[in-house]
């Protein structure tokens, strides 16, 4: 399983698209900021094993895609940029699907992956609750856009770490 340079370029392009989606000055929205508990240490640190790292990366990208591929999201953002972001996230997910399939075949049990995956799901659940509580306001979406930039930046760090291991996820 190999993460190509195109995969890494796609990750950087997704971050650029999120930056371009900025519609508001963040200053009026600062009172709406919240700590969503990004599992940054888990994602950026060295504590994940190969199967966990691939699973966490896939889950983060899937949850980010799910967040932006909604009716509420399409009402909040420039449609062209949003479609490009969703397409980019989908491409990254497809790249990872083969890796995830290999990992799942190699392991009889997915119990080792469940803890980190549940942490990621809990993080995104908090984001969905926040958006609903804030009634999907423009400020709430701006806070989430900035948060997703942090999350995708962290996931890019994990992807770089996976590639540094010779580009071969099996060498982790």
UniProtKB/Swiss-Prot annotation:
This protein's GO CC annotations: extracellular space
Note: IFN-tau genes are intronless. They evolved from IFN-omega genes in the ruminantia suborder and have continued to duplicate independently in different lineages of the ruminantia. They code for proteins very similar in sequence but with different biological potency and pattern of expression.
InterPro entries named among the record's database cross-references: 4_helix_cytokine-like_core, Interferon_alpha/beta/delta
Subcellular location: Secreted
GO molecular function: cytokine activity; hormone activity; type I interferon receptor binding
GO BP terms in the entry: adaptive immune response; B cell activation involved in immune response; defense response to virus; female pregnancy; humoral immune response; natural killer cell activation involved in immune response; positive regulation of biosynthetic process; response to exogenous dsRNA
Resulting phenotype, residue 6 to N: In IFN-tau2B and IFN-tau2C
Disulfide bridges in this chain: 1-99, 29-139
Tissue: Constitutively and exclusively expressed in the mononuclear cells of the extraembryonic trophectoderm.
Stretches that traverse the bilayer: none
Recorded superkingdom: Eukaryota
Name of this protein: Interferon tau-2
Sorted UniProt keywords: Antiviral defense, Cytokine, Disulfide bond, Glycoprotein, Hormone, Pregnancy, Secreted
Function of the molecule: Paracrine hormone primarily responsible for maternal recognition of pregnancy. Interacts with endometrial receptors, probably type I interferon receptors, and blocks estrogen receptor expression, preventing the estrogen-induced increase in oxytocin receptor expression in the endometrium. This results in the suppression of the pulsatile endometrial release of the luteolytic hormone prostaglandin F2-alpha, hindering the regression of the corpus luteum (luteolysis) and therefore a return to ovarian cyclicity.
Coiled coil regions in record: none
Gene3D superfamilies from the UniProt entry: 1.20.1250.10
Pfam family, any one: Interferon
Family to which the UniProt record says this protein belongs: Belongs to the alpha/beta interferon family. IFN-alphaII subfamily.
Residues linked to a glycan: 78
């Amino acid at each position: 399983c190999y993460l190509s340079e195109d995969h890494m370029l796609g990750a950087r392009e997704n971050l650029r698209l999120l930056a371009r989606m900025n519609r508001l000055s963040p200053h009026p929205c600062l009172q709406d900021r919240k700590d969503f508990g990004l599992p940054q240490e888990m994602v950026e640190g060295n504590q994940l094993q190969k199967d966990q790292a691939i699973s966490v990366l896939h889950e983060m990208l899937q949850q980010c895609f799910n967040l932006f591929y909604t009716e509420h999201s399409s009402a909040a953002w420039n449609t062209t940029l949003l479609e490009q972001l969703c397409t980019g996230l989908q491409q990254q997910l497809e790249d990872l699907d083969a890796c995830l399939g290999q990992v799942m075949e190699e392991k009889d049990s997915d119990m080792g992956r469940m803890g980190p995956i549940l942490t990621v799901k809990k993080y995104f659940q908090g984001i969905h609750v926040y958006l609903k509580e804030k009634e999907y306001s423009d400020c709430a979406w701006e806070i989430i856009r900035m948060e997703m930039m942090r999350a995708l930046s962290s996931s890019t760090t994990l992807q770089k770490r996976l590639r540094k291991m010779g580009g071969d996820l099996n060498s982790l």
